[in-house]
Amino acid sequence: MRAPSMDRAAVARVGAVASASVCALVAGVVLAQYIFTLKRKTGRKTKIIEMMPEFQKSSVRIKNPTRVEEIICGLIKGGAAKLQIITDFDMTLSRFSYKGKRCPTCHNIIDNCKLVTDECRKKLLQLKEKYYAIEVDPVLTVEEKYPYMVEWYTKSHGLLVQQALPKAKLKEIVAESDVMLKEGYENFFDKLQQHSIPVFIFSAGIGDVLEEVIRQAGVYHPNVKVVSNFMDFDETGVLKGFKGELIHVFNKHDGALRNTEYFNQLKDNSNIILLGDSQGDLRMADGVANVEHILKIGYLNDRVDELLEKYMDSYDIVLVQDESLEVANSILQKIL
């Protein structure tokens, strides 16, 4: 007796199942080959940084991906309990430019305010034009630049003192400025606060202005410590000078060592994410005695062609003309 023949619909269903099975098998083979190839190349099944879309942008430059992968894996393994952030402020947490226009540093916020006379502003601009060129000169060494930075800061601070700026006007000065924090700053600060991660902002700018910027942005959380050049006001609230040792872009090593007590309180926080935008910022973690893993992220904002090689030699990750905190936030997302 002949078995009843299958109707066309049943045949189609069987064919579809068989076809899907073949596709799944082929896809599985392709995936296995991909993983095998990755494993053979890197010694592991996958690379975390290859799976993070933020790392695939053209602005992200990494000289040694294997080293960066190892550091990030160490940071992830250590988790929140071992992490601390050490970061510069001007042009690192704040924007270098927006829609083609330069954004102000903490010093520029004061320089550009309506309380500063036109004559003083002209002198401050002349100082900036002279000394900024020295600061970013790719040929001069840090040691050669050092005395010029002291000259620049000392002269500009002297001019500001002559303006008799009132402390009561700082809030208004910041509110009226064009300062902007980098895209993603809320996520950055809020996530670190939620997980009680210490944030050490080490700035050669003006501390009073810096604090007002992050206060007005709503991100001056209790886990944030600011070390910078703080204004000294007289009993009537008028600027009379600056407190303590001068911090400029190339003496952060000395400043870091002066803050050893702070870092000693965080002796269990042996994993560091460091963010900066200059060669001097690389020394900001010098006060940390027990570093286990440190990831150095550098923003290269200006003179890219001249400085890229030097930055890639010194920073683990270089972000070229990047006005966001996307990369840092993506790493924090993996750790926390």
UniProtKB/Swiss-Prot annotation:
It catalyses: N(7)-methyl-GMP + H2O = N(7)-methylguanosine + phosphate; CMP + H2O = cytidine + phosphate; a ribonucleoside 5'-phosphate + H2O = a ribonucleoside + phosphate. N(7)-methyl-GMP binds at E135, S156. Nucleotidase which shows specific activity towards cytidine monophosphate (CMP) and 7-methylguanosine monophosphate (m(7)GMP). CMP seems to be the preferred substrate. Mg(2+) binds at D88, D90, D277. It is linked to P5N deficiency: Autosomal recessive condition causing hemolytic anemia characterized by marked basophilic stippling and the accumulation of high concentrations of pyrimidine nucleotides within the erythrocyte. It is implicated in the anemia of lead poisoning and is possibly associated with learning difficulties. Belongs to the pyrimidine 5'-nucleotidase family. It is found in: Cytoplasm. Substrate binds at S203, A204, K252. The keyword Metal-binding applies. Monomer. Pfam families: UMPH-1 (PF05822). The keyword Transferase applies. Changing N229S: In P5ND; almost complete loss of catalytic activity. PANTHER family: 5'-NUCLEOTIDASE, CYTOSOLIC 5'-NUCLEOTIDASE 3A. This is Cytosolic 5'-nucleotidase 3A. GO terms for biological process: defense response to virus; nucleotide metabolic process; pyrimidine nucleoside metabolic process. Changing L181P: In P5ND; reduced catalytic activity in vitro; reduced protein stability in vivo, probably through increased proteasomal degradation. The active site is at D88, D90. It comes from Homo sapiens (Human). GO terms for cellular component: cytoplasm; cytosol; endoplasmic reticulum; mitochondrion; nuclear body; nucleoplasm. It comes from the Eukaryota. Transmembrane segments: none annotated.
